[in-house]
């Protein structure tokens, strides 16, 4: 009896860390990342450049950062795209840390603040993180209602006024899709 040898190919999902980076951050696949970012950010993008994902600490005892995918688009916006399979109960903290480091590494001593570029963190999670029903949520820094009501009624506060146009979070929760 002759035994037939079969080659089984294991199919890995796009949520696998290796596959995710291979598809979106591999040299030559910039168009795939561009299309993905256009869909998420709802804007036309001319060019996307994949950057070194390592965030090098300034101090020896500072936490090192290694982003899944770091990219920059043609308007200068810097992006971190993270695939999170397990809820380690630190999504908000991790995103804030990564965003802060992406901002702090932009300017060198003596550079003008006007050179600061928008930074966006995109989390794709395999778990529910937010209480909202939407699978895609966008977080921006907005002003709270702090003015006395009479000033608000006189037009001194614009509804949903953005406190900083340089900071943005996107959460894509796969179980809600």
Residue map of PLM features:
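Elongated, amphipathic alpha-helical interaction scaffolds
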Residues: 1-177
């Amino acid at each position: 009896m002759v035994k037939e040898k079969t080659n089984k190919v294991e199919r890995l999902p796009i949520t696998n860390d290796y596959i995710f980076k291979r598809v979106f951050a591999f040299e030559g696949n910039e168009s795939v990342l561009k299309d993905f970012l256009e869909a998420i950010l709802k804007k036309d993008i001319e060019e996307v450049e994949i950057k070194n994902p390592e965030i090098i600490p300034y101090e020896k005892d500072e936490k090192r950062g290694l982003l899944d995918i770091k990219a920059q688009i043609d308007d200068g916006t810097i992006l971190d795209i993270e695939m999170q399979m397990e809820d380690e109960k630190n999504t908000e903290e991790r995103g804030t840390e990564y965003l802060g480091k992406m901002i702090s590494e932009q300017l060198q001593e003596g550079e003008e603040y006007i050179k600061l570029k928008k930074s966006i963190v995109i989390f794709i999670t395999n778990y529910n993180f937010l209480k909202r029903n939407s699978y895609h949520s966008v977080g921006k820094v907005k002003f709270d209602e702090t003015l006395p009501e009479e000033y608000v009624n006189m037009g001194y506060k614009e509804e949903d006024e953005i406190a900083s146009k340089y900071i943005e979070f996107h959460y894509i929760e796969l179980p809600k899709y």
